[in-house]
Amino acid sequence: MVEGLTVSLGRLGKGQKAEVVGLDEQGVVSTLQAGELERRLIEMGLVEGAHLEVLHEGFPGRDPIAVRVDDHTVALRRAEAAAVLVRLPKAAV
């Protein structure tokens, strides 16, 4: 993926790092009521400016994923991770 690009957390693979730039539930398939997914993601620490790294992908289907968010680890489904918009880091000069 292109560094500096904004993508959904659900598209990242194991070992990739990024920074949260926002949340967007539009088009996300979830069993939760409107607003509930966003509330849960915020409770997990997935807020603007948080730094994260994908630590683990489930087998089969790469679902769920384990993500280090700042100083703690959370697990979530890729479908829900699609609501988290992240920016990939730029290469160090």
Report the location of each language-model feature.
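Compact, charge-rich alpha-helical regulatory domains located at protein termini
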Residues: 1-47, 53-59, 63-93
